[in-house]
Structures are given as structure tokens and as C-alpha cells.
Amino acid sequence: MDQRKIINIQIYAYRLIPLDNSDLLIQLEAKILCLKSPNYSLNNILEINFPNTMIDGICAWKNNYIIIKTKQKLIVIELLNNNTIYRIVSEQVIFENMFLRYQKMISLNNFSKLLLNTMNGFIIMNEKEPYIFQLQYSFNHDYGFNSFIQIRKDELMCNSSEESKVFFIDLKIPKIITDIKDINIYTPDIDTFCFVNNDIVALGGDLRDGIYLFDINSRTKIKHYKEDWVGFHSLLNIGNNKFIGEAYAGRCYGESDDENEELFCTMFFEYDSQNNEIRKYKTGEGRIYAERRSNYIKFKNENKIAYYSNKKVYVENL
């Protein structure tokens, strides 16, 4: 029996953000929805609308603030009164008609900098005064990057699916410290990196390429886990050397009445650091292939996750 809570939002979504009190923020094309825990009912929600524009990216900021990137602006919003009302804190024009690649915008250095993913590299912005940002530098790269994870205060990992490489980048200078070749990424548009522990980072591979593990201290690839015809679109650390991945699994997992339906599912992994082994210990319920999917999130102080697929949001206990 499927134990997941399923919220049918009947519209495409792009990104989920966990809030305090286990409330859930959902980025749509031109609005943001805030659903209240524990029921996540669509009858009692906070809506933040952006008429006549499109939300190009979103990320959490400090103290219950969120940052929204539109075509031309950065907008900082504060959520108030237990996430039931909001106010616009700042609104600034940054780069006219600049869209983010894969809608990627992440916070760096404990919410003091922003990274904006561009078509040919990335931009770093400083918070020069509260909730006002200025350009620090642009880092150009011919093929651009797909996913990012900050591994130290001044060091970043990112990948380029076009080049089949993972890069370690020094953010101070900035420059590429080293790169690792032959890393095959099939769907680079979601969060394909995650920490496994303080020293190990995982990266989801393409339809046949499973999961890669990297030691961030030696900046080397240390493990390649493969499973026939299984690739991963999004990964998330869930603590204690455990992580989950959204697996594209063809017809291998889950159940469907339609023999032509291809399925996704959540796979659960544990990393054995002594033997450098990845062990799959659970496979979740299947769900139908969806063109639009989101990142995984884990709620603060609760043992449950959420994700979006095919116009539905799923909330699941771990």
C-alpha cells in the first residue's frame, strides 16, 4: 500500500523549498505557493504572485527569507506570521533579459553570496548591504555548468554534461583547480550532487551510469556504483552516511497497468566508508514518467521528504 501523501496541484512546478514548521514552498512558473504542515491542503495556502513575468530561479535565504530571480530582477521576500503573510524586502534590477541556465541559483558562504548559473559559466554576487546584492565577478566557461555544490568556504564542485567532466573550482581567484573526466550525466537540470558525509560527495549519472562518489579532500573519484539501466536525476543526503536518489528505472521497479509506461522511483542507499561500498537498502513506490520533476527536500527537524513529479507533490516518511 502506498503510504505517501499525494497533493495534486494540477500544474507544472519547478522547485521545492522546506520552511520552518515543515511548511512547503512550491515554485510555479509565475507564482509561489506555501502549503501548511501537516496536511498541505490546497484550500489554505499563501500565494505570492508575479504577474506578467516568469520566475527564473528561487533559493532559500537566511531567517525565513527567500530570493526570487525573474527575467530582470532579484526580489527578496520575507515570510511572516508563521508563513501566512509576506512582504517584499528589496527589489533590484540586475541584468536585463538574463535567464539562468537550468534555473539554478544557490546561496554560498552561509548566506552571504549568491551564485547565478549562466549560459556560459556563473556569476557571484555579494550582499553589500542587507538584502541588496552587487556583482563580485563572472566566471566564464565555454560549455557552462549544470549542477553545483559548495564543498568548502571557497571551493565549489560542478559538472558539465557536454564535456562529461566534474570540476573543482577555487572561488577566491577564481580558477579551475582540477577536473575529472568521463563523468556521464544524462539529466543535468536538477540537484544531481549531494553530500554523503563530510568527506564524500555523490553525483547521479546517466541512464546506465548509476552514481559516482568523490573524495573532496583528495579531489578524486573513489567509487562508481552501477545498476543496469538505472540513472539518477536528483540526490539528497538524509544523514548517517545515507542518501536517496530519484531513479529512472524503465519498467524495472514499481507497478503500472500500462506496459508502455516508464517509471521513476526513490532508491535508498547507505555508504560503507570502511569498505568504500554503496548498498541499496530500499526501493520506494514507482511513479509515472514525468517531463517536469523537482528536487528532493528533507524537512527541518522531521524524518520526512517531499518531491514533485507529474503535477503532484509527494510527502513521504523516511
Annotate the PLM regions.
Residues I11-I17, N52-W61, F95-I106, H141-I151, ...:
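Repeated scaffold domains used in trafficking and secretory/extracellular systems
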Residues A30, Q72, N120, E162, ...:
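Residue-level signature of beta-propeller blades and closely related beta-rich strand-turn architectures
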Residues I7-A30:
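Beta-strand-rich domains and repeat architectures in extracellular enzymes and scaffolds
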Residues S37-Y40, L79-N82, E127-P130, L171-P174, ...:
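Short loop/turn segments that connect beta-strands within beta-propeller blades
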Residues A247-L263:
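Short, conserved, GDST-rich strand-edge loop motifs in beta-rich repeat architectures
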Residues N21-D23, N63-N64, F111-S112, K153-D154, ...:
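Short coil/turn segments that connect the beta-strands within blades of beta-propeller domains
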Residues D2-N8, N43-N49, T84-E96, Y131-F139, ...:
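A short beta-strand motif characteristic of beta-propeller blades
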Residues E291-L318:
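Blade-level signature of beta-propeller repeat domains, shared across WD40, Kelch, NHL, RCC1
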